[in-house]
Amino acid sequence: MESENSSEQYDVLIVGAGHAGAQAAINLRQGKFEGTIGLFGDERAHPYERPPLSKEYLAGDKPFERILLRPEDFWGERGIDFQSGARVASVDPLAKTLRLANDREVAFGKLIWAAGGSPRMLPCPGAGAANIHAIRRKRDVDLIREQLDEAQRIVIVGGGYIGLEAAAVMRKMGKQVTVLEALDRVLARVAGPQLSRFYEGEHRAQGVDIRLESMVELFETDERGRAVAAVLTSGESLPMDMGLIGIGIVPEVGPLVSAGAAGGNGVDIDSQCRTSLPDVYAIGDCAAHGNPYADGAHIRLESVQNANDMARVAAMHILGKPMDYDAVPWFWSNQYDLKLQTVGLSTGFDDCVLRGDPAERSFSLAYLRDGQLIALDCVNKTKDYAQGRALITAKAHPDREQLADADLTLKEVALV
């Protein structure tokens, strides 16, 4: 629904009503910003949490009302003009205007771009079939749930967090699940080999057929336009009733890049979330930044933590209280009765230390680079996650032998 406020000019206009955009609006009001704020989302829904889409909402354990970021009347009560169904077609940074897909022109004093991304889909025949879905938005999951009664054989393409979380939900529903991963292990882009092997074993024990180094050549479709089989590059054909695609996102940055913003895989920002365009910020999944926990590499992070922390940095700059983005990254994933909590970034690690016994389904993996603790993957081990975060923030160099001793808390591990 469109807001009743017909204002076509805002002191701050926020494009994208996910975690990042919504939190930016909240932070501005919490910081006593008195100007006008527009919050434009392209979905026909109020701002909501994204992580439950592949977990509790997909499983039917949480209704939509319980994953709203705030009650629907929250925005209007705080003078935030929320508008749904608003998709941006172009931006004019000199005139400080943007044009929506319905040809409306909206002016802004400052622009916060928090548009996130769209699901990366397979570029193969049949990928657009009516029973092949991504898991990115509420409507994606609503369609999946509508079709589940007629779907027993589920093929999931992508062995990252989204794919594995969906696999766990589908197995709990009693579905026959196959996961296809192009690389030689699951979670290859986000975790070390030991964690990958652990999760492969857990899913296989639950009855999931995990196929590594497997890619889809095409989807065979029937006369109704529905995919009935996934044909692999090996020639093997897997009968299917539904396909789920979880192979990452394409950042929604076209209008900004076309307007002259620096970027490619996302919009480039500085440490205060400013793009190369004046008075234009970018935050969340679509923002490429030099991350101090990635050894200075220019990266994008797709997480609630990154969205919320960047939202705060952008809001503080607008409020005249600039700060640098230097938050330690963290992530989580729930699969079956396993709670994975990750803190830091393991990219470039040269040593990995196991704390605990994976057979007991409660352990941590500590990643080091040149002796410095840079990341932890904690499975059902919340204390390690909480205490390890402080060590990673401090760029600590723990004693390796003590680090491997799970009888010692991370607070008790000596530093060298």
Language model features with spans:
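Beta1-alpha1 glycine-rich phosphate/pyrophosphate-binding loop at the start
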Residues: 2-81, 169-191, 387
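Mid-to-C-terminal Rossmann-like scaffold of FAD/NAD(P)H-dependent oxidoreductases
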Residues: 2-3, 7-11, 30, 286-383
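C-terminal catalytic lobe of FAD-dependent flavoproteins
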Residues: 9, 228, 236-265, 338-416
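Residue-level detector of alpha-helix initiation sites
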Residues: 14, 18-19, 44, 117-119, ...
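Short hydrophobic core segments
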Residues: 14-15, 106-116, 157, 238-248, ...
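A Rossmann-like FAD-binding core segment of flavoenzymes
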Residues: 34, 76-77, 82-100, 106, ...
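Glycine-rich dinucleotide-binding loop and its adjacent helix/turn
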Residues: 115-173
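FAD-site-proximal beta/loop scaffold in flavoenzymes
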Residues: 128-151, 223-226, 236-313
